[in-house]
Regions:
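C-terminal or mid-to-C-terminal helical accessory/interaction module adjacent to the motor/catalytic core
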Residues: 1-45, 51
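Extended, charged helical/alpha-beta scaffold domains that provide interaction surfaces
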Residues: 36, 42-179
Length: 179
């Protein structure tokens, strides 16, 4: 019903012996962050908004590098879902994916983009969270596939370059021994 009750219930030990409590899960940390944020004080008044915020806090952090960025994603999603429209707009989704639709870069940058696309894929797959849900599900899937193919190429190239370098060094040493 209220933030205090929700946090208390999250802190309880599981009733089943074979389950164990994991302290400070990512979604719980996110919820505590937003409950302390002055911009989100109004959620305490409406139970639906608190449930919605909790659901948004459960968006997985696939990137796992920058907490601020993940909290920004959660905050943006929550603001759209709690607005009068109640859904993330096509324009917002388009802007998020345009930033990620780049096939250049090294293994780390490609992996990071894939992780970010997975976040938006998760959001797209949540029922009634985005306008034109089927379109965005397909769009995120295609973008993730393209980035994954490019990552595979980059990994293969890196592996082959290292292997060729090792072989070349080995051949050079063999030639030095023979002369």
């Amino acid at each position: 019903n209220n933030p205090t009750t929700l946090l208390k219930s999250l802190d309880e030990k599981p009733k089943k012996n074979w389950l164990r409590k994991i302290y400070e899960c990512e979604d719980e940390k996110a919820l505590k962050f937003f409950l302390k944020d002055k911009n989100f004080e109004n959620i305490q008044l409406i139970q639906e908004n608190l449930s919605l915020l909790w659901e948004c806090c459960q968006i997985p952090d696939f990137v796992k590098k920058t907490y601020g960025n993940h909290y920004e994603v959660i905050g943006n999603v929550y603001k759209f879902l709690s607005s009068s429209k109640g859904k993330i707009t096509d324009d917002f989704m388009r802007l998020q994916l345009i930033k990620l639709d780049k096939l250049d870069g090294n293994v780390d940058s490609l992996s990071n983009r894939i992780a970010n696309v997975r976040t938006w894929s998760y959001v797209s797959n949540k029922k009634n969270w985005v306008e034109n849900q089927n379109y965005w599900i397909e769009k995120t899937k295609l973008l993730e596939d393209r980035l994954s193919d490019r990552l595979h190429e980059e990994l293969t190239k890196t592996f082959i370059d290292k292997r060729a370098s090792i072989l070349a060094r080995g051949l050079k040493q063999d030639m030095e021994f023979k002369t």
